[in-house]
Each structure stands twice: as C-alpha cells, then as structure tokens.
C-alpha cells in the first residue's frame, strides 16, 4: 500500500494547515458556484441592513461594518465566506495538533467535521449569515484551546472568545460544550489525576459562566422579540419536548441512506461506543478513594447523552422552536467525538482500519456538491417566476397605473421539480433546502419592479375581484389602482417522468 503511506506520516503545522484549508475550501465550492440568494439574503441585500443586533448577534453587524468599511451591511459575498473559512482552517489545525502531538493526515481529518456537518450546509446557504456562523465555530474552538493551557489563568481569555462566538451565533455554545465533553473523555483516557480532572471541570464551568455573563451584558439588552423566551413549564411541556426530539431524530435519520453509509455509520458508532465503555471501566480501576472514582464515573457517563443533547442543545428549550437544520450545529461535535474514539480504538501503526475515517467525510463532501446543484435549481426556478411576474406586471401597467402591488401566498411547500429525483435518492435534501417560497417581494426589485409589498390577508372589508390573469404558479387580481399578486398553493406532483 505504498501510494497511501503518506496518510500515516506525521505532518508539520504548515502541512496540516494546507490540508485542512484545502478540504475546507473544497466544501464551500458548491456555494460559490451556485451564488444563490437565500431567504433573508433578499431583504438584507435590498436594504443593506442586517439587524442582527436585535437578534442577539451584534458580532455579525460588526463583521460587516469592518469588511464593508461602512455602517451598513453590504453584500460582499463570497469574500466574507472565504476569509472566515481560512480562519476556521487555522483553528482546526490548532485543534488537530492539540488532540495529537504529531498528527497525520488522517488525524487532521478527524477535526474536519466541525465544518463538514451535513446540517451546516443550510447555514452556509445564507450569503450574509453563513460567514458569521463559520467564524463562530472558529471562536468556539479558540475558546477551548485557551481553556486547556493554564486553565485558571486563561479563563478570562477563553470567556472572551466564548462571548464573541455567541455574539456571532448563539448555537456555537453547543459546539464549545461538546468540545469540553471530548476534552473530558481525553483526560480520563490519559489517566489524569482526579485533582486535575476536577480542576479542569471547574475551570470550564467558570469559563461558561463568565462567557454567558459577558454575552448577556453586551447583547441581551438590545434583543427584540421573543426568540429568547424559554418554553413554559406546564403539563404540555414534556410532550412538546418529546415531539421536538422525535422530529429532529427523524430528520437526522434521513442522513443514513444506502448500504455503504449505513455500514459506515454502524461500524464507527459501535467501535466508538465500545471504546467509550472501555474507558469507563478502566476508570473504576484507578487507585483512588471509591467516592472519587464513582463521582468521576457518573460524570463520564453523562458525556455521551450530553453530546447527543447538544446536537440541538438549548434551542430545544426555546418557546419559539426553530426546527430547521441550521440550528443543529452540535451534530458536528458528535461526529468529531465518534471519529476520535474510533481512531483511538485502532491498533497503533496500522493504516487500513484508519482509512475508514475517510468514508463519512467523503460522503459529506459529496452531499455538499449535490446540495449546491439543488441550490442552483432553486435559483433558476425563482428567477423564472420573478421574471414572469415582472413581465406580466409591466404588461398590465400599460393599460392602467398600478400604484401598489400586494404579494400574497409566498410561503409554500418545498416545490422544486428539478430536484425531486435527487430528493428521492437523498431524502435529507428537502430538510436542508427548506425554501418555502417561489419568490419574495424583495426579489422583484432585481427585475425592475419596486412597488410590490407583502401582505397576508386583504384589508378589512375588501374582497378580491376575479383574476385578470392566471398563470400556472400565480394569478393577478386588480382593484382600481392596486394589484394583488397571489402565488398559488401548488398541488401538481413534482416527479418528472419523460417518455422514451
């Protein structure tokens, strides 16, 4: 196996960085090629405003002020994504050299799922929000790395890194806590003293408390709306939590498709579980008082359920639950933990079992390119609808003056015939795309139509006249100088079966 022996050779810091940078850039190539304006990107690019501070994310406003040399939020895509991906590659390199004293190429790949999270593809779809979310991952990793050397003296630095990560994207907290769980597993496996274990845990709790306090002081006073409200504790709360967990479990299960991925996921999960159990049993053999062994043993047992909980984490507890893929940032750390435990289970100096690590990463990279093509298909459909609407509005405006046009019904099911066959093969694509619209009012100024506004219902006492124009995807009503553009609820099947 000489051609692939280089995979087992130790890499320098520079070589590790180039490997992780290349892999990271390769993962975002589909988004650069698709160049798709996604959801909130429409109104943000149209208004050149982000309004992230009122969502508890002032760091994103600051990011665009710095990169855009302005007080607004100008669309700079893809520059912010390229820059933040490069910074994340630096942090991933530091993390790989933290986990392994002399990391090989395969060792470096173990930390790659911090970015190679299939659910993070939806985050990367946002041209505005995506770079801030990538940077939040970078800062979460840095918070961990500043927690491990001289823990007590570096607590305030790590807390600042953590607060900065939360100011960019709050679910980054799930990533940091997940990294702390992996760190505890590594410490137990390395047979560190109980005093060292408890000192590290105490330091991490202090960092979390300080980071949350700093973030609360800087961001929470400016938050508007009810996004931070927690779920009401009542009789229906447990049922609501159970429904949310079941829904997320069903979506995560969509990832495992095909015999190869099923086999890969099963083997890595089983091996990682066995390794976790072996570390736990070895813990009971420590030459320490029984109460200490039992205490650390129970803390150790909590790490696995906690890693699973952190897939969605605190978003499960919010009153306004967001069931979308972009909130599942913690899934990345669950994959890192599984790959790390799998690697630690492989016999020393053996390459063949470790090559198995490449399979899930290759699958996630493949999914990224498939998803990029789906984004391109959605972009083409949206552009067609917007141009068709613009043409019809322009034709109607020649016979009468339309002072105002209301757009209604732009939230629809995921209807994308061009991607239906791909979704049948990869069911998770529909959950990742999650575009419940054909076009948005903010998309029409790109076609020269600037008097379109969104509304949900006709004004009180006003009834729509019979449509003057009916198209397959929408219809147009007129009332004096006001037009009503109603997107239809599409019932046609998406499947396309050409006759041969």
Regions found by a protein language model. Name each.
Residues 121-124, 173-175, 413-417:
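Short catalytic/ligand-binding loop motif for oxyanion handling, primarily in non-cytosolic enzymes
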Residues 109-113, 157-163, 300, 353-362:
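Central hydrophobic cores of alpha-helical transmembrane segments
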Residues 140-155, 189-192:
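Membrane-interface transmembrane helices that cradle and orient dolichyl/undecaprenyl
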Residues 2-54, 58, 64, 68-90, ...:
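Intrinsically disordered, polar/acidic, low-complexity terminal segments
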